[in-house]
Amino acid sequence: MNHSNHMHHDNHESHHHYSGHAHHHGNFKVKFFVSLIFAIPIILLSPMMGVNLPFQFTFPGSEWVVLILSTILFFYGGKPFLSGGKDEIAAKKPGMMTLVALGISVAYIYSLYAFYMNNFSSATGHTMDFFWELATLILIMLLGHWIEMNAVGNAGDALKKMAELLPNSAIKVMDNGQREEVKISDIMTDDIVEVKAGESIPTDGIIVQGQTSVDESLVTGESKKVQKNQNDNVIGGSINGSGTIQVKVTAVGEDGYLSQVMGLVNQAQNDKSSAELLSDKVAGYLFYFAVIVGVISFIVWMLIQNDVDFALERLVTVLVIACPHALGLAIPLVTARSTSIGAHNGLIIKNRESVEIAQHIDYVMMDKTGTLTEGNFSVNHYESFKNDLSNDTILSLFASLESQSNHPLAISIVDFTKSKNVSFTNPQDVNNIPGVGLEGLIDNKTYKITNVSYLDQHGFEYDNDLFIKLAQQGNSISYLIEDQQVIGMIAQGDQIKESSKQMVADLLSRHITPVMLTGDNDEVAHAVAKELGISDVHAQLMPEDKESIIKDYQSDGNKVMMVGDGINDAPSLIRADIGIAIGAGTDVAVDSGDIILVKSNPSDIIHFLTLSNNTMRKMVQNLWWGAGYNIVAVPLAAGALAFIGLILSPAVGAILMSLSTVIVAINAFTLKLK
């Protein structure tokens, strides 16, 4: 089946392997209640109940009932832990499941021995069994893991909500104009679908009829409704607000925005950062630490008291209280929450390492056009320098060449020329001049569009006073050359984004230096930089110059973040310690960029830094808890404070172990963007 032609969102739910027991999630709830039925009579018939109550539930042969029920409980209720431990050993990564499996196995096997000694041996005295402890241990473990898996599942909740945004069906407009409700999986590219007010838009597409306002808050985090007119793009999963629209489908299945986002997030969550690799290693050592401490505590208490029941209880408690799981989940749970929140707000984290690196960023380098400014240019001035050519002829020549480019400056010139009703032609042999402009043939004459740097480098004469006047007003200026003569010019202005000023101020408050990198001329660059409060400016750059500048800053030991276009600035984004591709829109699969910002909003740079800070704080909290819990709990379980009467039973150990993981999960779930 070709997924590029079919929509499939039935299986969007992410599959994160947070632990070796993730696949038992559905079993824990059922197993807990079934095990409870077996555990109640075991507990009621135990000698412990006779000590605590004025009457006993025991009857002749009740010890056999306890044995049979305990055996069923061990193999049924204990199965997730026994099979989980087996899987961990097979993978040569023994951890929490192996410890629990060892604990309940020791309790069960010793209880079998005690049952034999009490019923079939001629030895005098009574050997205490652990059937009561075994029952409570398995019950608490099942309950704890059921609660834990619910908490773990909530960590990636934002991503699951995204998966549920797409409807199951859509209204397809047939060739004969009839409307027909079809499954999403039957929708193909170029189909026309109709979406009424209040409905979820089923696929990515282009509006071909109607206009509306669209709520993208659940898709990109855009809080305000976005006005959409004919020929505007819409994203599948966003909510159609005010009018009925018809949408031509542009992407389905894995090519759709939501599918791409969830694919990138899943990939990021499966990759391990250096901090996670370290916590995994420590969690792995913790297994051996717990086993060694458990065995030593058994030997020491046998030497001190010669009481096998007490010594064995210490061993079992150590095995069940140690929780490499809390340490192992400390980072993955925060990551799941962080990447999901990011995706929900239009911040796609492709490289998790960048979240850690962001704590140490010294410089944020930004392209001017489209990042700090709107990138929507307006033509403010155009002029002919040749007596026999009118201003409109110059405009026509500019538009003819620029019609072959998709650069924002080019699009602005073409649109302006059309609005002036000035005609232009299709040129021949148009070539891009990197970092300069274009050249091509019009009516068998060669024309070049260049910047002022090209004129200076090649000794062309031009009106420098006019250039300075227009440039200081913030205009980008292009020149037209024919037969080694400058015959005309055009000046285009760009607006600074409202949020750029605040973003620069926020960077400075964080002691991060903003740097402007632009191919535009010095005058324009410094005019924009001055208004924004940026003092570090590099102008008139070729594409390769940006990469070189980043390298120079890094050579002094600085950490550099680069923000720019995911395609044109690809080398710079790759060179930087963190590359942020801004304004990706629905094309979130751009190759370069550790972080993808769906919107062209400079505020999202600060949002990423805030998310990074909050994420790292939660990771550190969880690591301290995971490590600190084990450092304190294991010696307590071994009986380190038994001399003052503080002794933990296996049941209490099981409760503490389950709680330790639940606390880590809840702490991860409290992570917020702001």
From Swiss-Prot:
Location(s) in or outside the cell: Cell membrane
One GO molecular-function entry: ATP binding
Main subcellular location of this protein, as a coarse class: membrane
Membrane topology type: Multi-pass membrane protein
GO CC list: plasma membrane
UniProt-annotated binding residues for Mg(2+): 565, 569
Enzyme Commission designation: 7.2.2.8
Residues passing through the membrane, by range: 32-52, 57-77, 95-115, 127-147, 284-304, 315-335, 623-645, 649-671
Active site location: 367 (4-aspartylphosphate intermediate)
GO biological process: copper ion homeostasis
Chemical reaction(s) catalysed: Cu(+)(in) + ATP + H2O = Cu(+)(out) + ADP + phosphate + H(+)
Record region (Disordered): 1-20
Main function: Involved in copper transport.
Listed NCBIfam families: ATPase-IB1_Cu (TIGR01511), ATPase-IB_hvy (TIGR01525), ATPase_P-type (TIGR01494)
Official protein name in the record: Probable copper-transporting P-type ATPase B
